[in-house]
């Protein structure tokens, strides 16, 4: 049940809000936990059962970590249990295929359906247990509060990956931080509508271009069409995921739960390192705090620091998908970050901002070809076709892949991914102001809502890309 679906917007969300606000405060967390479980059960009963199991294990584990004098053995056990569940569903087939490539037929290839949100709430649970073991937070005593923290349907499906230390003050329905004022509710509506517009009006339309290009073997397509298709994918990926994140933040505000920002206009970055500080911020910061720093971070010698970066980004790529193209995507980013740390960043700082920005965008685009292609070999074929500027087979024209409307949406996406907001600081401030919009802003939101709902009710929406991760 995508946030941009008819079922969610017209049934699930209004019903959950109505029941939540009609109940007394002491019962509201139970209502929120129940609706969150129903949300996950809609995607599959097995997935909901896995969620309940992991929630129980990590809640009990957190309680035990808070009491034991020697916490490390239990922490390792909890992390291994969480990763075993994630690995069994997400990576077992990939591992078997890799082994079978060397010893054919040795292992059965299992491909169980990945439970909704598993990659996200497993990382949330690991972070919670690690923080309890480190003494950064106290363990949560109330299982309902823990369920709301771990699996609130606003962030459970695709993040942001939340931290208990940030969320704990909001887990009490009677607290001041949980109070929803009129301005806060209006802010939630604004973020929900903006996210819906990003998804339904821009991302889903750009997906039409990419889907057509990706459905044709890269070796047969002219280079300009390959560039068009994967440029559309790059913009689709941003508007799809940042649109989801906006909707998640808006939904959280309705219930008095503030979720962390996950994007800060990443396509405005002037280095790949800066890009990762702006893109999927909750995942990047999770890997920084729970993998990179424990490995030694940047406190080590330069050679070890680079090794740490390669490990972290190989894992980051693997988190995104169980395929070698995802590992290669992560390693490429790790290599680029190593180069920036070895001196490239200092050299770039001598260049005008425009050149640094172009350097970043071009490298991102090239690596996203690997990430977004139907497979690693196809991604390499795309890059080969572009670098050799191949003519492709006859009969493939631009008009067959994108009409004027889609090209205009693609052009608009370049402006709206951050450039307009950077040029108009007042617009950026208005978009993120936690208060009711002005009359002009309200009119704009109504137009976006109308256009977004037109797409939704027409059945032209698709699942969010990050739901598959």
Model-derived features: positions:
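Membrane-embedded transmembrane alpha-helical bundles that form the catalytic cores
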Residues: 1-468
């Amino acid at each position: 049940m995508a946030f941009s679906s008819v079922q969610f917007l017209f049934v699930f969300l209004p019903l959950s809000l109505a029941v939540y606000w009609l109940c007394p405060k002491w019962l509201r967390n139970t209502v929120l936990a129940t609706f969150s479980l129903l949300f996950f059960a809609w995607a599959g009963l097995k997935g909901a059962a896995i969620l309940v199991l992991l929630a129980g294990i990590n809640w009990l584990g957190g309680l035990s970590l808070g009491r034991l004098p020697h916490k490390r053995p239990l922490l390792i056990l909890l992390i291994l249990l969480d990763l075993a569940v994630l690995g069994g569903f997400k990576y077992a087939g990939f591992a078997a295929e890799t082994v079978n490539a060397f010893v054919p037929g040795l292992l059965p290839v299992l491909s169980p359906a990945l439970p909704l949100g598993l990659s996200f709430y497993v990382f949330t649970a690991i972070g919670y247990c690690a923080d309890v073991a480190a003494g950064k937070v106290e363990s949560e005593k109330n299982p309902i509060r823990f369920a709301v923290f771990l699996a609130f349907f606003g962030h459970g499906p695709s993040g942001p990956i939340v931290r208990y230390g940030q969320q704990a003050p909001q887990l009490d329905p009677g607290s001041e931080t949980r109070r929803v004022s009129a301005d806060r509710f209006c802010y939630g509506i604004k973020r929900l509508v903006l996210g819906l517009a990003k998804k339904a009006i821009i991302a889903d339309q750009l997906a039409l271009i990419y889907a057509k290009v990706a459905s044709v073997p890269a070796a047969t397509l002219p280079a300009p069409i390959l560039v068009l298709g994967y440029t559309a994918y790059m913009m689709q990926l941003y508007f799809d995921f940042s649109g989801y994140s906006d909707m998640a933040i808006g939904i959280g505000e309705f219930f008095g739960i503030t979720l962390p920002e996950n994007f800060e206009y990443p396509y405005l970055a002037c280095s790949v390192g800066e890009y990762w500080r702006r893109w999927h911020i909750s995942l990047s910061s999770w890997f920084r705090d729970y993998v990179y720093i424990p490995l030694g971070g940047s406190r080590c010698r330069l050679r070890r620091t680079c090794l740490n970066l390669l490990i972290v980004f190989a894992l980051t790529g693997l988190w995104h998908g169980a395929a070698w193209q995802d590992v290669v995507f992560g390693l490429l980013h790790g290599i680029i970050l190593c180069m920036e740390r070895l001196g490239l960043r200092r050299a770039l700082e001598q260049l005008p901002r425009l050149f640094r920005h172009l350097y970043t965008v071009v490298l991102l685009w090239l690596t996203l070809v690997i990430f977004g292609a139907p497979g690693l070999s196809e991604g390499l074929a795309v890059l080969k076709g572009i670098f050799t500027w191949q003519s492709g087979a006859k009969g493939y024209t631009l008009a067959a892949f994108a009409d004027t409307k889609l090209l205009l949406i693609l052009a608009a996406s370049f402006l709206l991914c951050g450039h307009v907001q950077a040029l108009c600081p007042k617009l950026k401030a208005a978009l993120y102001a936690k208060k009711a919009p002005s009359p002009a802003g309200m009119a704009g939101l109504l137009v976006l809502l109308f256009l977004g709902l037109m797409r939704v009710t027409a059945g032209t929406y698709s699942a969010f890309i990050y739901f598959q991760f």
